[in-house]
Structure formats: C-alpha cells, structure tokens
C-alpha cells in the first residue's frame, strides 16, 4: 500500500473509531480537549504531496497535541489531538 493510501485509510479508520481513543480531527473550531495544543508545524514540514493532515499524523507519535495549518486548498487542517 502506498504511503498516501495508508494515510487516507488511517483517517477513515480513526474517524470511525474516534470514540475509542483514536486521533480526532477538527477544522477551524477546536474541541474542549484541544485548547492547549501549541506545537506548531512549520511550512517546510507540509510539502505539496504531504499536506498538513498527513504531516500531523506522522508527527503525532510524539504525543500531545499538534496545531497545523497549510493554506493550499487540498491541505487545510487546524488541529489534531489524541483523546484520552
């Protein structure tokens, strides 16, 4: 499976299992558990074929919360957070 397909599969899976402690995504409006997400991704980390969604997922293994933004039309993600 190509890396991009793995990412989309993971996003689909995490959306289905978000109530079971998986990663949850929000666009624009942070959830209550995301208020203290300060770790920022830099522009260089979000390259054209690896936009903020996949970039944030790869970095999430470090724990905590990640705030990410990429202004390209297909690459808009503001917050990711691991729910406890």
Curated annotation (Swiss-Prot):
It is found in: Secreted. The keyword Signal applies. Its main location: secreted. It comes from Arabidopsis thaliana. The keyword Secreted applies. Keywords: Antimicrobial, Disulfide bond, Fungicide, Plant defense, Secreted, Signal. Belongs to the DEFL family. The gene is LCR7. One of its GO terms (biological process) is killing of cells of another organism. InterPro entries: DEFL. This is Putative defensin-like protein 139.
């Amino acid at each position: 499976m190509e890396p991009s397909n793995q990412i989309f599969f993971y996003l689909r899976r995490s959306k289905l299992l978000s109530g079971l402690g998986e990663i949850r995504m929000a666009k624009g409006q942070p959830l209550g558990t995301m208020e203290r997400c300060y770790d920022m991704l830099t522009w260089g980390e979000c390259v054209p074929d690896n936009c903020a969604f996949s970039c944030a997922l790869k970095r999430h293994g470090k724990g905590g919360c990640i705030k990410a933004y990429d202004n390209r039309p297909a690459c808009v993600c503001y917050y990711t957070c691991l729910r406890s």
